[in-house]
Amino acid sequence: GYLKSILRDNDIIGVGMGTTIRYIATYAPRQFQNLTFIPLLGGTGNVDYTLDANHVVDHLSKAFCGEGQHLYVPAVVSHVQTKRTLMKEDSIRQIMNAYYHLNVALVGIGTADNTSSAFRSGYYSDEMKQQAVRDRVCGDICMHLFDKEGRTDCFPYNKQIVGVNLNKLKKVPYAIGIASGVRKAEAIRGAIKGGYINVLVTDAQCGEALTRLNDELNN
């Protein structure tokens, strides 16, 4: 219902990874023309191909009778220089440029632990996970880890991610975060503090947990 109220013909929609976003296809309104779906990060097929942003793009573009574009590179590369080299490719640069023109972004919000898709992707070594704990990381959006204040610079490995810079999400008219469950409350709050989402879709239990968390931190 909400998507139906905000989508317009010719919109460009950025899509993150995860099953929650893929399920949006179940409720897809079909009355829109020329919707374009693009992945907000490279491939994460190591964890489960159905979670991969490129796969989610395929799923949604089919459901909405739109067009899907793809980012056929790893979500995380081993060196920043590798990322710079990849960015010179026309097909990748085209996707990166499209991030400046997003009308809607659909992103999941993960927790910074082994239950999250980011940590289960196989891209993060045990050393990197330990670094995340030391840096007090609390959540992720599109594999970018952030702390409770929404800061991403706390985790140096974010620079090796091939995908949208979270600061670009701040300029998207509808940056929709989708997450549920009490354990996601701190991560959601960090995402809100960082300004990466301006719409939240969650459940009642998580909403109550967020309210309690805010009350505790403000007292």
Task: Give the label of every model feature segment.
Residues 1-30, 37:
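Helix-turn-helix/homeodomain-like alpha-helical modules used for DNA recognition
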Residues 9-11, 33, 102-103, 173:
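Short coil/turn segments at beta-strand junctions that form active-site/ligand-binding loops
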Residues 15, 37-39, 70, 177:
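Structural beta-sheet core signal
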Residues 18, 40-42, 73:
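Beta-hairpin (beta-strand-turn-beta-strand) motif
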Residues 29-31, 192-193:
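Short, surface-exposed basic-aromatic patches at helix termini and helix-loop junctions that form
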Residues 34-44:
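Catalytic or ion-translocation cores adjacent to nucleophile or general acid/base/metal-coordination motifs
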Residues 44-219:
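Conserved phosphate- and dinucleotide-binding cores of soluble alpha/beta proteins
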